[in-house]
Amino acid sequence: MNIIKRGGTEVPFDKSKIVTAILKANAQAKECDKLSNIDEMSEKIASHIADDIEGNLLSTGSVPNVEDVQDMVEEFISKSGKFKLAKSYAIYRYEHELLRKKNTTDDKILSLLNRNNEEINQENANKNPIVNSTQRDYMAGEVSKDLARRYIYPEDLMKAHDAGIIHLHDQDYQANTMTNCCLINMEDMLQNGTVISGTKIDKPKSFDTACNIATQILAQIASNQFGGQTINIYHLVPFVDISRQKIKKSLIKEFESVGIPYDEDKINKITENRLKEEIRHGVQTIQYQILTLMTTNGQTPFCSIFIYLDEAETPSLKKDYAMVIEEILKQRILGVKNQTGIYIAPTFPKILYVLEPDNIEDDGEYYYLTKLAAECSAKRMVPDYMSEKKLKELKEGNVFGTMGCRSLLSVWKDPETGKAKFWGRFNSGVCTINLPDVALSVMDDMLGEHDITEYTERDMSKFENLWSTKQDEIKEKFWKLLDERLKLVYDAQIIRHKRLRGVPSDVAPILWQHGAFARLKPGETIDKLLFDGYSTISLGYVGLYETVKSLTGKSQMDPSVKDFALSIVKHMKDICDSWNKIENIGFSVYGTPEESTTYKFAKSLRKRHGIIKDITDKDYVMNSYHTDVKEKVNAFDKLTNESPFQDFTTGGAISYVEVPNMTKNIEAVLAILKHIYNTTVYAEINCKLDCCQKCGYMGEISLIRDSNNKLIWKCPQCGNTDQNSMNIIRRVCGYMMNANVVNQGRLNEFENRVLHL
């Protein structure tokens, strides 16, 4: 068994250290409070306590951290009847904590530099903490976290964060005045020119050049934000005809210069052939540049490309757009080569493909593109799909992309034109509420059960019986505590908002001065873009499944409690609407992806509320409103059941279905897409895309438990367990990522996923 130290390193568990700590506290206690007046007997009792603690830890199957073990030491000393000794141990622990607080970052930074910080290794599946540039970002992040903890956030918010009641996202960037995610106004930057690193960039004169400039813009913007970015591929489409005319003119000149006769038809055919080659090259530039560029965040840009065919203003633009879309899909189907030369699915850019009558109906002119998209989904797990029909219902007739992964803007109309604007807007950040903790805190109170440890096994039938007899009282207490917890989120987000107020445009010229968001003057503050709903700031939530299960004993999709589940999400939306009116800020409800937060919240729930079947007996919490990963439900019912929750999660959310290998059953994929079009704002199809670099195996690589009961990947063909010599692609939180380096909580969630088809 291993244990995670405070600095994040994972080391073998050594129970002798527990014995030593107990005996040191024992030595400071009065004679009457000691374990025994005889030293040998005290050591024997301390050893028994250490044995009991080790047994409890082994029974959980998870890797504990030092704080968990110290809590258990206090608890077990108290159980032995030595309450004053337990207090002495707490004082001993507190004194050592004060010494550590003199410098809160050294241990973590040193473990990072020594490449043995297990927490950081598993924190972000797209950041390799061994690489120098990534290490520098993590080092800066540790300093930022320290500043956020000691200077930016008040103690009550940090305590709530540490206890897992809320999660203050992206603390590693809070010291900086940076924004989260955005929709880049690429149209303005390409058509009117921009400035990159002090160099003036004029309007491109070809599609190929436009693609190259777009990727340079992306890298610059990603380095000035901490979240994802989305570009609209349609903003590149006008350059297709510019290239067409350029190629045509060049061809005529070539033919004339050598005296070869030509006709219009021949020129047009050659032009279109060369144009397709340029489109292929331009799309390839976007694909490879995004994958190989590294931002100052030490990672590939978290980039999405948005595809909405009906956006084209003319038939000719629509045909050019279709050519670009077709090439994007064909290149993604091909994939990119890994280190051993095997074609695999690239993780970026994410593709957002809008389903509309022209491309989803069998007789639609562009249905062939959706068939290609379905083939791509079956082989490479992209695109993600957005429904024109549902978006227009929820967003006042507008269709636009998510900002990076899932964050979705509200409608904002330019007061000068009266028209809705989306490209060039952004999100300021997220704070997430742990909904299951609200529910379990209420149930603990209702049951009068407060003396709970993380090893207390709870009787779920008590929860169910209480709901059947005291439903109204439970609801009253739940709404009251929920509002108290939401106030914490509100306070945190007001602090975040105020951090951005007064910031000059000079901090990120490409964002604020050169077109990505605005064309502000040097020295002008960004304040006007923080109000009136131009930008958003998010109230995230997780664990609706565990919340409803805790209160009622049923899944949130059970017809008898689904209305109550919906009322929880609606309540959060109503709260955000009220905050908007008070502050004139764009608060929105957001379905939090919780890549690493899922493990943190799961551990905190177990620590605060004990072991409860299907709620805290696992190492993860369900994303937002998602159905339990273990629940057996078909893909169509899952999407239908989850759809109403998206309607209230207006700040962005994703539904997904888990499917087997669908490369031989594209018709079934198309059936799912048609269902998405009719029911769901935003959804994706998950399959298994793995490759063992040692033997070349392509298929699903297995999850097993090693000798420390830790989940690891193992190749079913050659038995390889070297986690660094595999390509394991899973969709974790809306993004595809390298799942061989995610945390144990997320691996536990993978382990429990069932197929929906």
Residue ranges and their predicted role:
Residues M1-R115, E751-L755:
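Charged, amphipathic alpha-helical regulatory modules used
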Residues E95-G533, K554, D558-T721, N727-I728:
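Conserved catalytic cores of very large enzyme subunits
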Residues I537-S550, K570, R731:
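Contiguous, well-ordered alpha-helical segments that form the cores/surfaces of helical PPI scaffolds
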Residues Q717-L757:
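Long insertion/accessory domains within large nucleic-acid-processing enzymes
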